From Swiss-Prot:
Protein name according to UniProt: CTP synthase
Tree of life domain: Bacteria
Residues noted as binding Mg(2+) in the record, renumbered to the chain: 72, 140
Entry annotation: catalytic residues: 380, 506, 508
Upper taxonomic lineage: Bacteria, Pseudomonadati, Thermodesulfobacteriota, Syntrophia, Syntrophales
Alphabetical list of InterPro entries matching this protein: Class_I_gatase-like, CTP_synthase, CTP_synthase_N, GATASE, GATase1_CTP_Synthase, P-loop_NTPase
Organism: Syntrophus aciditrophicus (strain SB)
SUPFAM superfamilies: Class I glutamine amidotransferase-like, P-loop containing nucleoside triphosphate hydrolases
Enzyme class: ligase
Length: 538
């Protein structure tokens, strides 16, 4: 079957949920038996988001092949079975870098290099190459219609549609239909203007997805269709939901997937959505609940930990349990102490991060978890700080630290990877992507995975310093995961604790609602046991 293309744009304002919409459409189409892939075209000039602040961009999602990408690729992976990679995220920076490199090589044979056709051709070539081997490719255009940065991408997809034909490519426009409480009615004018801006650059949407609080009436749909030059049957409600995994089911009930396959002339059966129905049922009607504290430095923007938050929810699904997340700023703990911030918490998770801000607060929290037998899960920086805390307060190495935060520490229990010492550039220069890990028998990690050889994704420069391995192991630290050559420490645990585990990798990137990651599933299971014990002791 020839590849079909679905281009998804957004209007009126940002953060409408284009990524979630693209992922949900892909999920329903995959449930119809189609091979799907997603692409994200980002209009910023950065080559990738790897060096961008989490407060500006949110999470950096790492793929198996080591790409640092937009967080929407995390949505794509969680909603479909397709693994994302470097070819699934294109930025303006990458486009211009490639075109300028070709110009310097002489590929354009002396021509004047321009946005049209050279930049737009580069974008179109990328779309084609990244879609090979799939039945349907969903391409999300970042930003909002009207942004000057998005114009080359919009022009490229306009040309692309003309080249492949209307039965092989469609445009879906996600827009906002606000409900004005004082007037008691929904307003369609923002949508009208958004579509008008899109049509002015030559793109006529085939389908409108209207983000709103409640389902739109037939009268409102008819009005939108009239002013936006689409048929009434092509106006769909993208209703606000409390559970994002309900979105594929809502889209199917609205008939969106049927409309798409009709427009693209795809013959498929009805989708098998039982797995999604089961996920939603377990999230909305759980038998148990736990409170998990996420202690980090980017908690003021929860998108900074998007995959982490979702992986904890997945762990709850695997235990028929609602997971209540409590975000705790580690920098505030440094200033004010614990101050009841961990009261009634059933598990503590310290996630990854960079820089020394808030690390002493993390160490206080880890000590609390260790001494009070609270289930603890440390990821990347969280694992490193667990090692520092153990070295200081159990092994008596009072000034132990990571050389990232104190170059003059007498005990650098966490140190720079040897291959990183000569690295000068920041972008895409860390230990990135999937690496194998060998687990020790009779460990929490091996018990969770059920195997001794695993592969997980990494994003770090610093590692456990093996010069301190013997000293820390003598005090009760267990190294239960190593690289196959034994050179790098990947997982640590401690003796005499019900569940205390730190890993150097990022397991959250491989968790799905239909396949919860084993470490998150076991962490939530341990939190449930702790909650039950806490209730019995009261």
């Amino acid at each position: 079957m020839r590849t079909k293309y679905i281009f998804i744009t957004g209007g009126v304002l940002s953060s409408l949920g284009k990524g979630l919409a693209a992922a949900s459409i892909a999920a329903v189409l995959e449930c119809r038996g189609l091979r799907v892939t997603n692409q994200k075209l980002d209009p910023y000039i950065n080559v990738d988001p790897g060096t961008m602040s989490p407060f500006q961009h949110g999470e950096v999602f790492v793929t198996d092949d080591g790409a640092e990408t937009d967080l929407d690729l995390g949505h794509y992976e969680r909603f479909t079975s397709t693994r994302m990679g470097k070819s699934n995220n294109l930025t303006t920076g990458q486009v211009y870098f490639s075109v300028i490199t070709k110009e310097r090589r002489g590929d354009y044979l002396g021509k004047t290099v321009q946005v049209i056709p050279h930049i737009t051709n580069e974008i179109k070539d990328y779309i084609r190459q990244s879609s090979e081997g799939f039945d349907v490719a969903l391409i999300e255009i970042g930003g909002t219609v009207g942004d000057i940065e998005s114009l080359p991408f919009l022009e490229a997809i306009r040309q692309f549609r003309n080249e492949v034909g209307k039965q092989n490519a469609i445009f879906i426009h996600l827009t906002w239909v606000p409900f004005i409480k004082t007037a008691g009615e929904v307003k369609t004018k923002p949508t009208q203007h958004s579509v008008k801006a899109l049509r002015e650059i030559g793109i006529q949407p085939d389908i409108l997805l209207c983000r709103t609080e409640e389902f739109l009436s037939e009268d409102i749909k008819a009005k939108i269709a009239l002013f936006c030059n689409v048929e009434e049957a092509a106006v769909f409600t993208a209703k606000d939901v409390s559970c994002i995994y309900e979105v594929p089911l809502i889209y199917h009930r609205e008939g969106l997937d049927q409309k798409i396959v009709d427009l693209l002339n795809i013959w498929t059966g009805q989708p098998h959505l039982e797995a999604w129905e089961n996920v939603v049922q377990k999230i909305t009607s759980p038998s148990y609940e736990v409170n998990i504290a996420i202690v980090g430095k980017y908690v003021n923007l929860t998108d900074s930990y998007k995959s982490l938050n979702e992986a904890l929810v997945h762990g709850g699904i695997g235990n028929d349990c609602q997971v209540n997340l409590r975000f705790v700023d580690s920098e505030k703990i440094e200033k004010d102490g614990l101050n009841h911030q961990l009261e009634n918490v059933d598990g503590i998770l310290v996630p990854g991060g960079f820089g020394n801000r808030g690390i002493e607060g993390m160490i206080q929290v880890i000590r609390y978890a260790r001494e009070n037998k609270v289930p603890f899960f440390g990821i990347c920086l969280g694992m490193q700080m667990a090692v520092v805390e153990f070295a200081r307060h159990v092994c008596g190495l009072e000034k132990a630290n990571s050389s990232e935060f104190d170059e003059n520490t007498p005990h650098p229990v966490i140190d720079l990877l040897p291959e990183q010492k000569a690295v000068q550039e920041m972008g895409a220069s860390m230990r990135l992507g999937s690496y194998p890990c060998r687990l020790s028998d009779a460990s929490l990690a091996c018990e969770a995975y059920g195997e001794v050889e695993i592969g997980e994704r990494h994003r770090h420069r610093y590692e456990f310093n093996r010069d301190y391995q013997e000293r820390l192991e003598a005090c009760g630290l267990r190294i239960t995961g190593r690289s196959p050559d034994g050179r790098l420490v990947e997982i640590v645990e401690i003796k005499d604790h019900p569940w205390f585990l730190g890993c150097q990798f990022h397991p959250e990137f491989k968790s799905r609602p239909t396949e919860p990651h084993p470490l998150f599933q076991r962490f939530i299971e341990a939190a449930l046991r702790y909650r039950k014990k806490r209730a019995e002791d009261q």
